[in-house]
From Swiss-Prot:
It comes from Salmonella arizonae (strain ATCC BAA-731 / CDC346-86 / RSK2980). Pfam families: MerR_2. Interacts with CbpA and inhibits both the DnaJ-like co-chaperone activity and the DNA binding activity of CbpA. Together with CbpA, modulates the activity of the DnaK chaperone system. Does not inhibit the co-chaperone activity of DnaJ. This is Chaperone modulatory protein CbpM. InterPro entries: CbpM (IPR022835). Belongs to the CbpM family. It comes from the Bacteria.
Amino acid sequence: MANITVTFTITEFCLHTGVTEEELNEIVGLGVIEPYEDDNANWQFDDRAASVVQRALRLREELALDWPGIAVALTLLEENSRLREENRQLLLRLSRFISHP
């Protein structure tokens, strides 16, 4: 099964997510998402970037965070998710050595 990645130009991305170009520049500047091209005029974004921005917009609405706060929150959420997965894997490995009655 092939993976299909949808890409967006700056204009398409802004229309799809509802952010302005100014907000997009700030989001990229904060490292929340990264475009495919470093050249500002030719930025391309994938569907994963769109879902990250939509998640960021929910945080902005629900918690009234500014973009730097959203960047920190997303970083912490990703780290939390990574640690949960690591913990799950370690528990699986540990369960091999623990005998259950």
